[in-house]
Amino acid sequence: MKKLVVITGASSGIGEAIARRFSEEGHPLLLVARRVERLEALNLPNTLCEKVDVTDQASLITAIEKAEAQFGPADVLVNNAGVMLLGQIDTQDAAEWKRMFDVNVLGLLNGMHSVLASMKARNSGTIINISSIAGKKTFPDHAAYCGTKFAVHAISENVREEVAASNARVTTIAPGAVETELLSHTTSQDIKDGYDAWKVDMGGVLAADDVARAVMFAYQQPQNVCIREIALAPTKQQP
């Protein structure tokens, strides 16, 4: 049996597509999300589905320990769980900022903390953090969200440097516009309408599986090759 893959936020969109790709390659999976029924509905073989909020580190550690007891050490963690709540700083509900930083930044740190000690001890392992083009440049209405994704880029690169001597890899995947549920949680209808119009102007956006294929490409390199970052976007996406 191939090595264990842990994926957060796997109940839809990019996380679901990544889960399907790794399952097709024969990997056992630990899938975590708040909507566990969506995970179970994927009906993937050799898969443990756990209801976990990534902001709850203890629950995440418990789920990983349970999966490792069944499938062996986690060889890869895909930190995919994320929230995108767009808005102008002067009008946006401050609770939305906190929710994004809790999930996108602290949740990511919780995931890395949960697996890194074991990876360093084994001198092997890969962490793949799903960030965004919004972690490389700014966009209107994205101030707080960009802040979280710039943090993901900084954390990923810093930790990559720290664990490189232990033969552990850290990769950042930075997608542009992707067809997922992320935008649906934004409360401003004007912002959502503008985003939808932008997607039409581009002639369409990335599919979740486009991002999943980038993840697989990075992971399937030999362990002595670390793809530090992949940025991908629709060809017609200018910013």
What residue spans do the PLM features occupy?
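Conserved glycine-rich cofactor-binding loop
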Residues: 11-12
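Conserved glycine-rich Rossmann-like NAD(P)H-binding loop of the short-chain dehydrogenase/reductase
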Residues: 25-40
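The beta1-alpha1 cofactor-binding region of Rossmann-like NAD(H)/NADP(H)-dependent oxidoreductases
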Residues: 52-62, 94
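Substrate-binding pocket helix/loop in short-chain dehydrogenase/reductase
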Residues: 88-89, 96-98
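Active-site helix of classical SDR
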Residues: 112, 148
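Residue(s) in the substrate-gating loop at a strand-loop-helix junction
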Residues: 132
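C-terminal helical subdomain
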Residues: 172-173, 193-234, 238
